[in-house]
């Protein structure tokens, strides 16, 4: 029995246009090989019949991309701004003739183990339930009210409760058993003028279908907003490159010594009843300690100094030189000074935060290291915490840092300082430290960078390809989420 996949592509992608994207949203690349539509098509058997709905004024270059899909048909409709359901309604006469119809948004990505479409006996709304970084503070999705997988009602752009991460969230994939019933339900939405933000949505059609059930996917991501799209791309790239990078960095001469300050109190973790030091939290798919994951992204010829507070870590002795402090310090930079007496003054040092790591160009690092007194790691800050007030931001030109803004909102044309630093020698570190010590109650290495700029040291920045921050409970959850997402089969 034939099955169909309908994908409406008649939108304008205004959020992307407003952010300066030049490619129409469904055709944006999510990785080297696939655009948004490719990733959806590949979830289904090759012989499924594909129906694309496009505007009559769609550019020819996009039509050519659609025409490459085997066993497909394109329907042209008049331009409108009334949402995906209205697009579907404009080809309703064709849909009445067919059955077993999958309907998919163009801007979703999902995975489900053993996804089968051979024998589907009911109308389904495909849903995700659980913690998700994009829904932690946002319920602007469609949600289903269910009992034993039967759907009783669907809301669009709002949840039924305040605990929406425990509700079935419609991912934007639907299955209609019968074309006529599908069209009848669509007509009822439009005839009753059931618009949300002046648009008609397919989810609401299921309120007019008698028998409907929920079917859960394992993982899901909405990539229809520029920030979500960029975050998804970052983690997708991370998953594809991390194994290669970890192998390559093992032989990099990153510095003579590596220092990892880990003597903070971890207040944000304590506030959420996480009572072990954050760098010992189990993270990722393999449940390794955070500090062990960071070690994998550093050269293996070095045994980093790991500076802790009141914590004996004998089981880490094989990888780290653990230095256990008896009392709290005045901050990250102050912590680093506690091991500098063990390092000759002409030796270079690399400082890596205990909760972050980067994937970066090793060749660019080597080039910048040669001409730098201090080399600062920076990021485009593709994170869900992009608007934090606690970040430090740098302004640079041709990699040379011109200014630094500490613990403030993001400034225009700035990059996020990540927490990893190279110092040509400990004398440079100490000169900057002494200046900062006189001025600050909490001495961050960020403060040392600020003093270095004033003293005309050669301070450069390297923009990483991927910046991974696990420094708050939420960011740690995000890391775990994406690690599992891209390892799902």
Please identify what each model-predicted range represents.
Residues 1-60, 246-312:
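N-terminal glycine-rich phosphate-binding loop and ensuing alpha1 helix
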Residues 3-5, 14, 167-258, 267, ...:
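Conserved alpha/beta core of the MobA/IspD/sugar-nucleotide pyrophosphorylase nucleotidyltransferase superfamily
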Residues 11, 107, 225, 264, ...:
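Active-site glycine-centered loops adjacent to acidic/histidine catalytic or metal-binding residues
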Residues 53-55, 75-78, 157, 214-217, ...:
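Conserved beta-strand termini and adjacent loop/short-helix elements that scaffold enzyme active sites
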Residues 59-146, 312-392, 431:
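Conserved beta-loop-beta/alpha segment of the NTase-like Rossmann-fold superfamily
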